[in-house]
Curated annotation (Swiss-Prot):
Protein name: Ribosome rescue factor SmrB
Keyword annotations of the record: Endonuclease, Hydrolase, Nuclease, RNA-binding, rRNA-binding
Main enzyme class: hydrolase
An individual GO BP term: rescue of stalled ribosome
């Protein structure tokens, strides 16, 4: 609680003398609106929709033509093969990691869709997908799914420090960041 400052009798009289002929201001023009909370979290419905939208591209029936010799790799036709070389050498370090161990194929598709959506939303260019060895189902299917997605620019078997032949480093096409328009 604030302390009241007491004015001397002289100061009070001087104040009243200076304020004669004035009237109290009526507050009728400015409406104070309550401050809105900033939206920092993405709504769960939106996240689920992004996940579904991005996993829509993954088909088990379509088999893209991938090179079966050597390590697992893919580069989109409009992307430089030098990007693939940089992935192989480990020049890109992944910012997001996805572990698919123990997931079903359907769950893996959804998680891949969520990873791609998260990378695009957060402007993350490189990510690592760890499919593991297991029964080789996800190891075989993951590259086929990724090659079908339009936002995947390239992928290559990860270097040893990121999982070796049990993981893939992927390059994701992200939208250029645009500053918000001012009114």
């Amino acid at each position: 609680m604030k302390k009241k400052t007491s004015l001397s009798e002289e100061d009070q009289a001087l104040f009243r003398q200076l304020m004669t002929g004035t009237r109290k201001i009526k507050q009728d023009t400015i409406v104070h609106r309550p401050q809105r909370k900033k939206i920092t979290e993405v709504a769960p419905k939106r996240l689920l929709q992004e996940q579904v939208d991005n996993s829509h591209y993954f088909s088990d029936e379509f088999q893209p033509l991938l090179n079966t010799e050597g390590s697992t790799k893919y580069v989109r036709p409009d992307v430089s093969h030098f990007e693939l070389k940089k992935l192989r050498r480990g020049d890109y370090s992944p910012e997001l990691f996805l572990d698919l161990h123990g997931l079903t194929q359907q769950q893996a598709k959804q998680e891949l869709g969520a990873l791609i959506a998260a990378c695009r939303r957060e402007h993350v260019f490189c990510a690592c997908v760890m499919h593991g060895h297991g029964k080789h189902i996800l190891k075989q299917q993951t590259p086929l799914w990724l090659a079908q997605h339009p936002h995947i620019m390239a992928f290559h078997q990860a270097p040893k420090e990121y999982g070796g032949d049990a993981a893939l480093l992927i390059l994701i096409e992200v939208e250029e960041w645009q500053p918000p328009e001012l009114p």
